[in-house]
């Protein structure tokens, strides 16, 4: 993920916070926290808290690592959490974990401009 961001002209560093965040910036802009979620097959499992409070304005990159007919490909879906809040699905339990499916993120594929 870091290599992909560097290739696209972003400056990247790992956050020193407990969460696995990247800090991304371009030019002289202030660093933006970016959460990265990676799977080999969908859905992505996420916490309800990602869609509430200050996290709602954060950007998440959903990474799908696919292998089809022996060929590896990586797809990136770059989206603001608030844009996916209505797509978050959660079982009828007290578990704070739910999921985001592939159809929910399709329109955000390679949406790198949101980080600029």
What are these regions (language model features)?
Residues 1-18, 24-116:
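Mixed-charge (Asp/Glu-Lys/Arg
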